[in-house]
């Protein structure tokens, strides 16, 4: 919408709404992420019916941020005008284990368990009151460094797969995901600002939450003939904040999202797509693709029933392969040019076309 619609944007100094909104930037926010890790993975064939898998991983996470004055209000800055870096460094060990049982050739049953971690990039602010995982107030370093411990958790999953004569491929799984050390905003409180000495409203951020997600996934692929594949899938999940530790220092503050369906996540998703390749004749190796995806309504406010409506989009494509080396493709997204919102204030893409040429060596 607006004068920026269908405009070409410069990669060097992008201005989507130029000549309409001439805003001058005063400073740049510089961020740098670096992640490295070591891992080991192995699959063991116990016998012709049992297989086991195990893996271990050590991750090292580094994040830093700084600010700098910009040149002439544009998106350029001098390194000499940059502030000192504020840094977050953390590491974590995670693992995963799985077991597969094959009672007959067409069926396999599996179970898996794995752990995860997710670092927080939170930096100290004098306008925030910080509470640890026990609900106790603490004072982070003002010079940077880790404020909140990383989110940690685990995932457990069981599933089944059935394959028959290259005609049917079915898989289904049920999962449970647990998250600990979830950071929540518990409200505000008026206190004296350490920098200015004035009374200000401070946000209370607390690492007191525990959340979980449970759901299932189903997928079925059918090959009526060798040149046609039809696939359909269904997913359902329920994500909620399950527990919020009560703070002894601030007992009057609670989070209304406890045990309430989470916002920003669709509960049900569904997709179906088909691919057909002409096997012989003048148009041999010409392929057609058609797909449809459904997304359940996404709540932005569960209590007040505010949400983005459910959405169904259709995409299509043509592919032509020459001597198994060169592939020409034309994809059409949002085939029927449906108007929709990607999020509350972001308009979804209209019908759009993408052409590609690829070569396989």
Q: Language-model features: where?
A:
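Residues on the lipid-exposed face of transmembrane beta-strands in outer-membrane beta-barrel proteins
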Residues: 38-44, 97-101, 158-162, 218-222, ...
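Residues that define the transmembrane beta-barrel architecture of outer-membrane proteins
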Residues: 32-36, 89-93, 152-156, 212-216, ...
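Solvent-exposed loop segments that connect transmembrane elements
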Residues: 1-24, 63-91, 121-146, 184-206, ...
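Outer-membrane beta-barrel domain signature
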Residues: 27-29, 84-87, 145-149, 205-207, ...
């Amino acid at each position: 919408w607006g004068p920026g619609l269908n405009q070409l944007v410069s990669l060097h100094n992008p201005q989507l709404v130029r000549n309409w909104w001439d805003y001058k930037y005063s400073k740049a926010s510089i961020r740098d992420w670096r992640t490295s890790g070591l891992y080991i993975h192995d699959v063991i064939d116990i016998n012709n019916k049992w297989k086991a898998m195990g893996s271990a991983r050590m991750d090292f996470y580094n994040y830093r941020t700084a600010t700098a004055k910009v040149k002439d209000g544009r998106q350029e800055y001098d390194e000499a005008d940059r502030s000192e870096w504020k840094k977050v460094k953390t590491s974590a060990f995670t693992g995963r284990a799985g077991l597969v049982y094959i009672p007959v050739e067409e069926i396999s049953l599996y179970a898996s368990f794995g752990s995860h971690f997710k670092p927080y990039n939170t930096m100290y602010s004098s306008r925030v009151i910080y509470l640890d995982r026990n609900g106790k107030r603490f004072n982070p370093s003002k010079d940077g460094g880790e404020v909140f411990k990383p989110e940690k958790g685990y995932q457990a999953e069981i599933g089944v797969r059935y394959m028959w004569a290259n005609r049917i491929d079915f898989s289904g799984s049920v999962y449970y995901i647990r998250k600990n050390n979830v950071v929540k905003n518990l409200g505000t409180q008026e206190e004296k600002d350490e920098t200015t000495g004035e009374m200000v409203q401070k946000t209370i951020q607390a690492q007191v939450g525990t959340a979980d997600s449970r759901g299932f996934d189903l997928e079925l692929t059918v090959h009526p003939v060798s040149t046609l594949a039809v696939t359909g899938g269904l997913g359902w999940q329920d994500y909620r904040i399950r527990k919020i530790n009560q703070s002894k220092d601030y007992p009057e503050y609670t989070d209304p999202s406890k045990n309430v369906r989470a916002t920003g996540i669709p509960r049900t998703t569904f997709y179906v797509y088909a691919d057909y390749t002409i096997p012989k004749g003048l148009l041999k190796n010409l392929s057609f693709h058609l797909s449809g995806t459904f997304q359940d309504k996404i709540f932005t406010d569960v209590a007040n029933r505010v949400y983005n409506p459910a959405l169904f989009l259709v995409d299509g494509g043509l592919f032509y392969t020459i001597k198994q080396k060169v592939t020409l493709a034309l994809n059409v997204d949002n085939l029927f040019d449906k108007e929709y919102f990607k999020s509350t204030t972001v308009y979804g893409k209209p019908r759009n076309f993408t052409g590609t040429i690829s070569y396989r060596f």
